[in-house]
A protein has these predicted regions:
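Beta1/beta-strand and adjacent pyrophosphate-binding region of the FAD-binding site
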Residues: 2-14, 162-170
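Residues at the starts of beta-strands that form the adenosine-phosphate
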Residues: 5, 28, 163, 185-188, ...
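Short hydrophobic core segments
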Residues: 7-9, 120-133, 165-167, 245-254
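Beta1-alpha1 glycine-rich phosphate/pyrophosphate-binding loop at the start
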Residues: 11-89, 174-203, 271-272
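A Rossmann-like FAD-binding core segment of flavoenzymes
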Residues: 88, 92-113, 120-123, 182-273
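Rossmann-like dinucleotide-binding core of oxidoreductases
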Residues: 126-149, 158-219, 319-327
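FAD-site-proximal beta/loop scaffold in flavoenzymes
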Residues: 144-158, 255-304
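A conserved FAD-binding loop/helix module that cradles the flavin
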Residues: 294-327
Length: 327
């Protein structure tokens, strides 16, 4: 069995930052991810532009460059690959962590790779940095599991000349609706609220509002989907029930951390907020020796922690681990 000082679950920016900080303190670390490096960013829309500036996405003291004021998805992917190479981080991609057994200083992490081969690793400490983008919020309506219903939006081309419903009114939904419209889809936006979210990026919000006002994108507000069929959707609006011809549905109503994995790992969650119990100084959980990093610290309040502030969790955790493990 391969042994490490620390096994890190999750190879997003926060997980990479943890690996860097541990390596700089002379600690061995293995990073395991069920997807690719920065898997969540890879699954962002192809043309996404970050809301923040490059220096706020940096980890390990490595500068991030961008051709524009704000970096895009492609630039971020390239940057994090470069950082992983520079620090020679030990990363296992496409490997699912199944269980974390044992206790502080003597953990056994069991996993399965994409070929179905099982692995075991010994670790003195464990860090969970699993993010929140893997589990989409569900509509809980009949037909949601049809192949035409998608919870992630990548790019618009496949939906040219199709009838597409976009559910939601935050950044993901607004961007998807606009790109789909620009590419020739017939777009309908459905949202339970009164209007487009005030948190939508300033260069997107007026654009989507103008398309709605002009009728170029059809909008149903204070409305919700009640049923999805192969060729239509049924929704309830303030004017009553409507049935729309439909080819594809993008249910972009948010995401949440993999709470089931946390509970299975023995992490205590607050019943009201689903926040894991952690030490605010060290980010160690109530399960001794297991630390939490990144957005999962916030429970259901995923708008509290982003790459910009979660990237500092690595130093916070690594400092405590190094002090406890000693020389």
């Amino acid at each position: 069995m391969n042994s490490f000082d620390v096994v890190i679950v999750g190879a997003g920016p926060t997980g990479l930052a943890c690996g860097i900080e541990l390596k700089q303190r002379g600690r061995s670390a293995l990073i395991i991810d069920k997807g690719c490096v920065v898997n969540s960013i890879y699954h962002y829309p192809t043309n996404l532009v970050f809301f923040t500036t490059p220096e706020l996405l940096e980890i390990g003291g490595i500068p991030m460059t961008s051709l524009n004021e704000k970096p895009n998805r492609h630039e971020a992917l390239k940057y994090y690959r470069r950082v992983a190479d520079y620090f020679k981080l030990n990363i296992h991609q496409y490997e699912q962590v199944d269980s974390i057994e044992g206790s502080d200083l003597n953990f056994t992490v069991r996993s399965t790779d994409r070929d179905g081969v099982h692995h075991e690793y010994s670790a003195r400490k464990v860090i969970l940095a699993t993010g929140y983008y893997d589990v989409p919020n569900r509509l809980n309506v009949p037909g949601e599991d049809l192949p035409k219903v998608l919870h992630y939006y990548k790019e618009p081309h496949p939906y040219y000349n199709q009838d597409v419903v976009v559910i939601g009114a935050k950044n993901s939904a607004a961007l998807a609706a606009l790109e789909l419209y620009w590419t020739g889809a017939r777009v309908t936006l459905v949202h339970r609220g009164e209007h487009i979210s005030s948190k939508v990026k300033y260069w997107i919000k007026p654009n989507i509002e103008n398309r709605l006002k002009a009728g170029e994108i059809t909008g149903y507000f204070r409305s919700h989907i009640t049923e999805i069929s192969p060729n239509s959707v049924r929704l309830v609006t303030p004017e009553g029930e409507k049935v729309l011809t439909n080819d594809f549905v993008f249910a972009l109503v948010g995401y949440r951390p993999d709470l089931e994995f946390l509970e299975r790992t023995g992490i205590s969650l607050d019943p009201a907020t689903l926040r894991p119990q952690t030490d605010k100084h060290t980010l160690e959980s109530a399960r001794n020796g297991v630390y939490l990093a990144g957005v999962i610290v916030a429970g259901m309040h995923t708008n509290e922690i982003f790459i910009e502030n979660g990237r500092f969790h690595g130093a916070q955790i690594a400092q405590d681990i190094a002090a406890r493990l000693g020389s």
